[in-house]
Amino acid sequence: MGLLGYFRSDIPKKSSAKLAKDRLQIIVAHEHSNAVCPAYLPEMQNEIIEVIRKFMKISNDDVKCEFSDNAEDDMSVLEVNITLPKNR
């Protein structure tokens, strides 16, 4: 084996385009997972509360909103829990 044999590898190397694509996908997935909640979420929550208030009396404390983002399934979930009054 010559001197250049030490620098060569039997493992096929990825092309620079493939390597760049893989790195970009990792960065995009990381940025997507760091997104806590969309900017429109507070406004949406207020509008949901206003629609429900047309039909029954509730306070802001009766509404719990939770936003979760699952990067694996490429799905976002907005869960809204409303404690309804006993006398509807």
UniProtKB/Swiss-Prot annotation:
<keyword id="KW-0132">Cell division</keyword>
<dbReference type="InterPro" id="IPR036707">
    <property type="entry name" value="MinE_sf"/>
</dbReference>
<keyword id="KW-0131">Cell cycle</keyword>
<dbReference type="InterPro" id="IPR005527">
    <property type="entry name" value="MinE"/>
</dbReference>
<dbReference type="GO" id="GO:0032955">
    <property type="term" value="P:regulation of division septum assembly"/>
</dbReference>
<protein>
    <recommendedName>
        <fullName>Cell division topological specificity factor</fullName>
    </recommendedName>
</protein>
<comment type="similarity">
    <text>Belongs to the MinE family.</text>
</comment>
<dbReference type="Pfam" id="PF03776">
    <property type="entry name" value="MinE"/>
</dbReference>
<dbReference type="GO" id="GO:0051301">
    <property type="term" value="P:cell division"/>
</dbReference>
<comment type="function">
    <text>Prevents the cell division inhibition by proteins MinC and MinD at internal division sites while permitting inhibition at polar sites. This ensures cell division at the proper site by restricting the formation of a division septum at the midpoint of the long axis of the cell.</text>
</comment>
